Amino acid sequence: MRFIFPTIAVLLEASMIVLFGFFVKYETEQNAIQQPNSTNSTKVDRSLELYPLFQDVHVMIFVGFGFLMTFLKKYGFSSVGINLLIAALGLQWGTFVQGMVHRHGQTIYIGIKNMINADFSTATVLISFGAVLGKISPTQMLIMTIIEITVFAGNEYVVGEIFQASDIGASMTIHAFGAYFGLAVAGVLYRTGLRKGHEKEESEYHSDLFAMIGTLFLWMFWPSFNSAIAETAEEQYLAIINTYLSLVACVLTAYAMSSLVGHRGKLDMVHIQNATLAGGVAVGTCADMKIHPYGSLIIGSIAGMVSVLGFRFLTPCLTAKLRIHDTCGVHNLHGLPGVVGGLSSIVAILLGVSTASSMTMQAAALGSSIGSAIAGGLITGLILRFIVRGQPSKDNFFDDSVYWEVPKEKELDNV
């Protein structure tokens, strides 16, 4: 940790400096080249109109995702701290890789929209991080960030440019992709003994309360996430309204289902922290379609129920039968709702509410996102396990003290 992690971190940042030096310029420089006799103020003003949406998405990345993972009582430092680390790397690498893919190797002109797209690419890694939370080293996470964003950019290009599929809120390309990539990595890195649980894989009253803060930030800003890259004002309007309605419906069904499957009808905080967000994930693909307000409510309701049922029945099955330990339950918050989102878009096109794509291309996009995620995740897992290595021992899983200076229990009691 003392030498390997700092060396890799510094080398990666040095690489970013070199790459940005050769390939990245300000968007205003492109405007000056294309229209040398005109002022750039108009285009800059239009770009700055996206800044509030960028900030909303930024809050989701750093505060929402970070605090959502603080439910583990002895892993809060890593949940928020490593989230910041990989997000900082992911934003730089995402800007470069996506720029290279879409500009076909030419100069990248960075603007607010590029920064939003970089946030999106980083979100995939943070989703995957939830599947391996507590079982992976910071060094391994840096390498995983580089590989995953590269695979993500390739799949996003295939879905958007080749298949011409509609996925404005990225239910398929971000949520489903990130979840199944993370599950594939978790499967390769699986350690025997996790099937029966780990003594440190527990929450406490205050850690669950911190995680709920992350939930609330994500819930409030999800309409911005789904509408940030809308091409027209009408599409943005539809995305905001549809996401809002799906989220509120999701909350009701998530609470109801949690009580139904819970012990003595009690609510489970794990369900509430996660399943209440599933509506935002599920409606993402068809958020800019005229699916009618009741359609958004239906999608959100289904997502809330599917997510809770996944936590209650599917997660234990994945661990016991398939040897895939999903720490945060990303399969239930992002994976299954992401699939619901892809299927919802197919149904929407079938019913004639959208002509943005075809059912075949939407199905192909869903298959490509899941397939590339699993393949990329398996390869990444093998690289992390046998080449990068450094995974903590099973006894040190879910423990901040392995990588952080942690106050002793007596010091905490005196505070």
UniProtKB/Swiss-Prot annotation:
Transmembrane segments: 3-23, 52-72, 77-97, 116-136, 143-163, 168-188, 209-229, 237-257, 269-287, 291-311, 333-353, 364-384
Gene3D superfamilies linked: Ammonium transporter AmtB like domains (1.10.3430.10)
Record-level GO cellular component terms: membrane; plasma membrane
Membrane topology value: Multi-pass membrane protein
Keywords of the record: Ammonia transport, Glycoprotein, Membrane, Transmembrane, Transmembrane helix, Transport
Residues of this chain annotated as glycosylated in UniProt: 37, 40
Catalytic activity annotation: methylamine(out) = methylamine(in); NH4(+)(in) = NH4(+)(out); CO2(out) = CO2(in)
Origin superkingdom: Eukaryota
Subunit structure of this chain's protein: Homodimer. Heterotrimer; a RHCE monomer interacts with a RHAG homodimer. Component of the ankyrin-1 complex in the erythrocyte, composed of ANK1, RHCE, RHAG, SLC4A1, EPB42, GYPA, GYPB and AQP1. Interacts with GYPB (via the N-terminal); this interaction bridges the (RHAG)2(RHCE) heterotrimer with the SLC4A1 Band 3 I dimer complexed with GYPA.
Job description of the protein: Component of the ankyrin-1 complex, a multiprotein complex involved in the stability and shape of the erythrocyte membrane. Heterotrimer with RHCE (RHAG)2(RHCE), that transports ammonium and its related derivative methylammonium, in both neutral and ionic forms, across the erythrocyte membrane. The transport of NH4(+) is electrogenic and masks the NH3 transport. Also, may act as a CO2 channel. Moreover in erythrocyte, regulates RHD membrane expression and is associated with rhesus blood group antigen expression.
The protein's name in its UniProt record: Ammonium transporter Rh type A
Source organism: Canis lupus familiaris
